[in-house]
Swiss-Prot record:
Pfam families: Ribosomal_L17. One of its GO terms (molecular function) is structural constituent of ribosome. Part of the 50S ribosomal subunit. Contacts protein L32. This is Large ribosomal subunit protein bL17. Keywords: Ribonucleoprotein, Ribosomal protein. One of its GO terms (biological process) is translation. InterPro entries: Ribosomal_bL17, Ribosomal_bL17_CS, Ribosomal_bL17_sf. The keyword Cell membrane does not apply. It comes from Carboxydothermus hydrogenoformans (strain ATCC BAA-161 / DSM 6008 / Z-2901). The gene is rplQ.
């Protein structure tokens, strides 16, 4: 299976991705490293696709992944209906240059 390891154990990596995706859906955009951004984008796209069909089962699946209940409400009431006619591609990654400390490529991940 193809995915980024991000230099962390499985539990830490999953917790970090859950935090990134929760922040992305809450704020609309996040700044992070390129590898983290690509991983977060993939998960966010799947959750937004899930939110296009507002059922109890889909809400519970989203709630099992996201940390905040208010973000799940926003996902199903605002974000899902906004992209109802769009067949994917709900987020965009924009490179913003290297980080000053270690030169890691930083990106802006944002909802369209």
């Amino acid at each position: 299976m193809y995915h980024y390891k991000l230099g962390r154990r499985k539990d830490h990596r999953e917790a970090m991705l859950r935090n990134l995706v929760t922040s992305l859906l809450k704020e609309g955009k996040i700044i992070t490293t390129e590898a983290r951004g690509k991983s977060a984008k993939a998960v966010a796209e799947k959750l937004i696709t899930l939110a296009k069909n507002d059922t109890l089962h889909n809400r519970r699946q989203a709630l099992a992944y996201l940390y905040e209940e208010n973000v799940v409400r926003k996902l199903f009431k605002e974000i899902g209906p906004k992209y109802a006619d769009r067949p994917g591609g709900y987020t965009r990654i924009v490179k913003i240059g290297p980080r000053r400390g270690d030169g890691a490529m930083m990106v802006l991940v944002e909802l369209l």
